[in-house]
Amino acid sequence: MPSLRLLAILTTLLAVVLIATQSSATRTTRRPKPQNTKKPPRGGGTGGGGGGGDQPARLGFRQTTTTMAPSSSLGTDETTEDTMTDAYSLSPTDSTTYAGDAYPTEFHTDSMALPGAGMGNYTLDYSHCYLNVCECCPPEKGRGPPGERGPPGPGAERGLPGVPGEKGDVGLMGPPGLDGMPGATGLEGDKGDKGDQGDTGMPGAPGILGKEGPKGDLGPKGEKGETGLPGLKGDLGERGKPGWNGTQGEKGDLGKIGPAGPSGLTGPMGQNGQKGEMGECPTGEKGEKGEAGLPGPPGPRGLVGTPGVNGTNGLPGPVGLRGQLGSPGGKGEAGGRGPPGLRGMPGPKGEKGPKGPRGVRGPKGPQGETAEQIRSAFSVGLFPSKSFPPPGLPVKFDKILYNEEEHWDPMLSKFNCTHPGVYVFSYHITVRNRPLRAALVINGVKKLRTRDSLYGQDIDQASNLALLRLASGDQVWLETLRDWNGVYSSSEDDSTFTGFLLYADPKA
């Protein structure tokens, strides 16, 4: 948008420059204005010496109207002005000195004055003349030498206003102007009336999750909800820790009677009985079918009979008529407990039950045997006479601070490992007069190194600490390297070497 505004401003400026150029090009050059003098009027003239307002008869006025042609970007410019013309010239022109310019050859007299214009005294101001003329003769053709530049004439008085010209025709409608610059922001209007309620808008996007609010107060206890659907089978839980040794509980009550076992196997069929003798009663007529009798009460359960001998299959009897369905009988009394059935097939493995409650803590057990506590430690220092020990050899720590287990050998200045395990070793060395390079050595292998670059009478401290695993029979000592043996000790400064067992390895 700023580029469009700049283009509009440049176009407007260009239009103004073009209008000004065309306006200056179409203006006619004014003729010199006559000067009123006190000379006597010419013959045939009228009027006294005070006729300064009359124009000379030889000069006339001509109204010139210039109309600008319409262009694509400029409007119509109509200019009307009154120009004074010389009676010798046909139209207003610029000054010229070329011989080719044409002028009328006839002689103009005072009779050419405009009607109603009186003859007055006047004198031409030659400094404003465009042609080589004089008062007594008309100009002649030809090109004269250029004259010298005359002095500027006095300021002329403003002439009378000319006759207003006729109203010109309405010009063609110009093209629409460029868009103007945006106006300033208007004043804030009054608050309008409340509009009608709009339709419900689309639901907005969910906002950003706000910060978690403070924990609310405990609400009232809700009503018991409906029983939910059974949950899915959970994963197998971890094996619980064994409970404490609890006391033996009392004997429980007798459990409920278990369900009846499966039916026993069918016993072998007994032998057929002997056929009975025919009765004496002759065969009577077949009687009518009697009504179905009421079901009798269930009889007592019979005793289990002895298994019969395998008999032969008898002849199948005639198919009897189907009797009517009897009404169900009443519930009989529970029979006695039958003998236990055979052991059934083992069922599938049941699911793991919930973790039971923790058992009661059992009684305190008897005191065990006291374990043998393994100890191994030492702490030694350096006497002042053993300061600056020779390099490459164990430092002679002969000032015993602790060595109850006698695992430190003062003759060799070495620690002998008796109990395998993890040991802690540390040393604090006072350094003076010369630099120090010390190393913690295990079986001839340097495991830990320390360096302190010190010269002069300054005193410094060098220390280190490490955990090392040792086997039975390992030896540990401290030694200096090369000529950097600035180990120092005095009545006010000590250099110490300490070690102790942290964890002993379990016995095999």
From Swiss-Prot:
Biased composition, class Low complexity, residue ranges: 170-182
Residue ranges, compositional bias (Basic and acidic residues): 188-197, 212-226
Comp. bias regions, Polar residues: 62-75
GO molecular function per UniProt: calcium ion binding
Annotated glycosylation sites: N121, N416
Major subcellular site: secreted
Protein name (database record): Otolin-1
Organism: Oncorhynchus keta
Species classification: Eukaryota, Metazoa, Chordata, Craniata, Vertebrata
